[in-house]
Amino acid sequence: MNQNRPASSPTGKDESELIDFGYRQVPRNDKEAMVADVFSSVAPSYDLMNDLMSAGIHRLWKDALMDWMAPRPEQMLVDLAGGTGDIALRFLKRSGGSAHIIDINADMLAAGKKRAALKPYAAQLQWTVASAQAIPLDDKSADRVTIAFGLRNVTDRMAALREAFRILKPGGRFCCLEFSHISQPQLSALYDIWSFQALPRIGRLVAGDEDAYRYLAESIRQFPDQNTLMGMMAEAGFAQIRYRNLSQGIAAIHSGWKLD
């Protein structure tokens, strides 16, 4: 037996391989725990964090996601990296269906449960600590799958996309809302100043964690651009793939369908 062979993950990846964590390169098998630490740190102020990172515009982006998804009654949503339940709650408000929130971070889910407890549709929510790379749900069990501001934090994004495809019913739809790549250089320069100079300082003052906010800004720049993500979705099996830029590409919604 070869005792020196590299460890491998359930997805067949070499766990000793280096992968991006913001602008740093870290061992693949360390990233998930490092991301979990970041979100444990920011969980109590996560919604405020989104307000700071987007100047409050994330609320309009999430409305745009719901408008494009057009939820229908009795649909079942699986929201990956669902954190505090913001997307699931918006979905239920519009559809009256049900939602299953998946997140690797128990602190984020605890914040979500507390937030949802007084909502009229709290009983229609399920919460599960699990990775988007290994979703503990049956094949063809979801009508819709979403991931909002979470795919860039996933260690193996292709594995997460394939899992989203696996759990969708034929005719089901996947939507990803994520910070993306700005199309106008002038706006990009201003956004860099905000992200790398102002945001970490605000994070230190508001949440007491400058490093977490710096990582989040770096992770946005490391995320694939709009066309690259379309190609990844096609590789995972999705069809009729489209994207819409929001706020000149600061964020984008990607949509894909499982046809059979």
Go through the PLM ranges and name each one:
Residues M1-D37:
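N-terminal auxiliary segments of SAM/dcSAM-dependent transferases
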Residues S41, S45-L48, L52-M76, R90:
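Conserved alpha-helix/loop element of class I SAM-dependent methyltransferases that forms part
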Residues M76-A134:
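Class I SAM-dependent methyltransferase SAM/SAH-binding core
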Residues Q133-R144:
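A short acidic, Gly/Pro-enriched loop at the edge of an enzyme's catalytic core
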Residues D143-R157, S180:
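A short SAM/SAH-binding and catalytic strip from SAM-dependent methyltransferases
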Residues M158-R173:
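A short glycine-rich, Lys/Arg-flanked "PGG" loop and its adjoining helix->strand segment in the class I
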Residues R173-G203:
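Conserved class I S-adenosyl-L-methionine
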Residues M230, A236-D260:
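Core SAM-dependent methyltransferase catalytic element
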